[in-house]
Amino acid sequence: METIPALRPFVQQPTVRLTTYRRDGRPVGTAVSIAVDGRRAYVRTFESAGKFKRIRHNPLVEVAPSTLRGEATGPAIRARVRVLAGDEAERARRLIVRKHPLLHGVLVPLGHRLTGKKTVHLELTPLEGADGRSDTRERAAA
């Protein structure tokens, strides 16, 4: 499946800054690993993570290429998050493990098991047309 333009910057990107929003609207950015498949991107976290709690309250997020520390290195796109279950979650897990075999094939699952944390898989769907950019000035310049 061909990758849509909004997600192309993330295909080779190992880490992105996922910005979620507190109830009062303040943004919180977190570095997460990402995998892209066509029209969707996938990330994982654990069920008790702050970002997951914020996503359950507000599924609108921003995603930007970033360093491993979560410092944005490119423009953000807006996206809607959906929590996956069953076969969809398994498919997302496989895509993430394929892109990040050591980190998400061994280390993250081991860490979640040792701490008793439940892993959740999330699907990100870009908003705002083909480019998904969050800043109208960025869209005008493109």
How would you describe each model-predicted region?
Residues 48-128:
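Short, structured beta-strand-loop surface elements
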Residues 7-11, 16-20, 36-40, 51-58, ...:
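Short linear motifs at secondary-structure transitions and domain/linker junctions
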Residues 31, 88, 136-138:
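Generic signature of intrinsically disordered, low-complexity, basic-rich segments
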Residues 1-17, 71-73, 136-142:
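Extreme N-terminal tail/first-helix region
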Residues 13-47, 61-65, 74-77:
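Short beta-strand segments
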Residues 125, 129-140:
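Short, charged, intrinsically disordered terminal tails
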Residues 42, 87, 130-132:
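Residue-level signal for secondary-structure boundary sites
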Residues 2-5, 28-30, 48-50, 108-109:
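A generic local structural motif
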